[in-house]
C-alpha cells in the first residue's frame, strides 16, 4: 500500500498543501490522481483538514479556490496567540528532562485545559465549515490526536466510532490556542505535538509521499527532526518540504487567516516545480 501523508502547519499548512497538490496537477495530472487515490491518507493537524477535504471527492481546483476566497477566510478565527508564546509554554512543559514523553504530553494537556480559548462549539463550527463532507469516506483516512489523560497518540479512522468533524477538530486542537476536544469521556489535543507527520501511523504501507509545510531542517523536541523521522520509515518515501519561497510566503504567523492566499500560491508554484520528481517516484 501507498500512503499520502499530510503534515501539520497551521492555516499556512492547509493552504500550502492544497497548493502543492494543485501545482502537481497542473503539470502532471496523472500524478495528482494517483496521489489523491493513495490507499491510505494520513493527516496530522492542518494535514487532517486537507486529508478529509480531498477524501470528500471535491476537486482540488475547488479546494484551492477556497484558499483564495475572502469569504471562506472570514469563517476562520485569528486566535491572537503568537507561535513564540505557544513555544514558551511547551518548553516549560518539557521539564524536567527525565520525565517520559507521555508525562510531558500530559503536562502540555494541562496547559491546554487551562488556556483561555474560544468555546468547543465555536471551534467545532469552524471545522464543520472547512470540511465538504462530515461523513467518513469509505476509503482509509487516518487522523491523529493525543489523549491528554495518557499522553498517547490516537489514530482515528472510520471504524473508531468518532464523528469525522470531531476527529479533525481534535487533530487541529493546538494546545494553548484552541480548546481540547471532548469525545466521550476523553479529551484530545493536536496530534502534531508528538510529530507533525506521525509516520508511525502508516508503517503498514510500503511507500509514502509526505508533504511537510516546514523547512527540511525543522527540529523536534522528541528526536532529531521530521526529516530523520521520514528517513527512518521502513518503506520508500518521497518528502516535499516547504522551500525558501514557500516559507517566506507563510509569514510570521502560521495561524493568521491572512497567510492563506500567499501560502496557497507559493505551494502551487512549488508543486509545479516538484511535479516531475513526484511523478518519477510514482513510476509515471
Predicted regions and their residues:
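Patatin-like phospholipase
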Residues: 1-44, 49-284
